[in-house]
């Protein structure tokens, strides 16, 4: 399991907010309690990519959760553009052609993460989508493919971390959304753990959104999460 020099890097704050102004306010309130921020579709379509570039220039780390999946050339060029923004992580869907294209487009400093199965999915959802395998087996299969292709890490639920680690080895990254501090509501995530449980399960980075973005004191919540992971 790769170790970060700064324990704050283990926490990725999900900026699932409506606009850049709201994201700026939250980042300011969190201050030095967090160093790593995730930008997904909602904010990306509202000026979030320029904001990500600005965060990178200010020394923050950024995770562009764009889940790319298209023809190879489009993915490859899209990854190059993300790299030019100074992003640290970028997600693609874990389809072999997509992953190979992403690896071709990857620049220095950018790590590609493959999304195996959304953490909001359970076995019933996977079956409805037409997959014959249960979620755990599908995650393991895709993790093996990703490792063989040269992907840097895997996005998966904490419950699958052990199986994924066995497929990608000790140097691969495991990034887990659906993390909720003790007592927080699960929201739309179906497979969740606390930060401490996730760290004990071998997770490298945890993604936390609403428990921080909706908190009265987001800085304090971020500090508590980092401390919980440090003490594991």
From Swiss-Prot:
As for what it does, the entry says: Catalyzes the decarboxylation of orotidine 5'-monophosphate (OMP) to uridine 5'-monophosphate (UMP).
The UniProt entry, under PANTHER family, shows: OROTIDINE 5'-PHOSPHATE DECARBOXYLASE (PTHR32119:SF2)
Keywords for the protein's UniProt record, in alphabetical order: Decarboxylase, Lyase, Pyrimidine biosynthesis
Q: How does it assemble?
A: Homodimer.
| PROSITE patterns to which the protein is assigned, alphabetical | OMPDECASE
> Where does this protein act, in terms of pathway?
Pyrimidine metabolism; UMP biosynthesis via de novo pathway; UMP from orotate: step 2/2
Top class in the EC scheme: lyase
Q: Organism's domain of life?
A: Bacteria
EC number, as in UniProt: 4.1.1.23
Any idea which residues are catalytic in this one?
67 (proton donor)
Quote the protein name from its UniProt record.
Orotidine 5'-phosphate decarboxylase
Any GO MF annotation of the entry:
orotidine-5'-phosphate decarboxylase activity
Sorted alphabetically, the Gene Ontology BP terms of this entry are: 'de novo' pyrimidine nucleobase biosynthetic process; 'de novo' UMP biosynthetic process
> What is catalysed by this protein?
orotidine 5'-phosphate + H(+) = UMP + CO2
Would the keyword Lyase turn up in this protein's UniProt record? yes
Protein family per UniProt: Belongs to the OMP decarboxylase family. Type 1 subfamily.
The protein's organism comes out as Methylorubrum populi (strain ATCC BAA-705 / NCIMB 13946 / BJ001)
């Amino acid at each position: 399991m790769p170790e970060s020099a700064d324990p704050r890097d283990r926490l990725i704050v999900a900026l699932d907010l409506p606009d850049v102004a709201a994201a700026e306010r939250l980042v300011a309130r969190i201050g030095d309690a967090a160093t790593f921020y995730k930008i997904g579709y909602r904010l990306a379509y509202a000026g979030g990519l320029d904001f990500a570039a600005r965060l990178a220039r200010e020394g923050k780390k950024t995770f562009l959760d764009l889940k790319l999946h298209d023809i190879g050339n489009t993915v490859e060029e899209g990854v190059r553009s993300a790299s030019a923004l100074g992003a640290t992580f970028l997600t693609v869907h874990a389809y072999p052609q997509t992953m190979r294209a992403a690896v071709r487009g990857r620049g220095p400093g950018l790590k590609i993460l493959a999304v195996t199965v959304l953490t909001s999915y359970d076995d019933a959802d996977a079956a409805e989508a037409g997959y014959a395998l249960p979620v755990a087996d599908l995650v393991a299969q895709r993790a093996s493919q990703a490792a063989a292709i040269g992907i840097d890490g895997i996005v998966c639920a904490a419950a699958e971390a052990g199986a994924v680690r066995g497929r990608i080895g000790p140097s691969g990254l495991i990034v887990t959304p659906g993390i909720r501090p003790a007592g927080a509501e699960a929201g739309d995530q179906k497979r969740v753990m606390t930060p401490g449980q996730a760290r004990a399960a071998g997770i490298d980075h945890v993604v936390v959104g609403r428990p921080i973005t909706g908190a009265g004191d987001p800085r304090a919540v971020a500090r508590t999460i980092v401390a919980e992971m440090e003490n594991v």
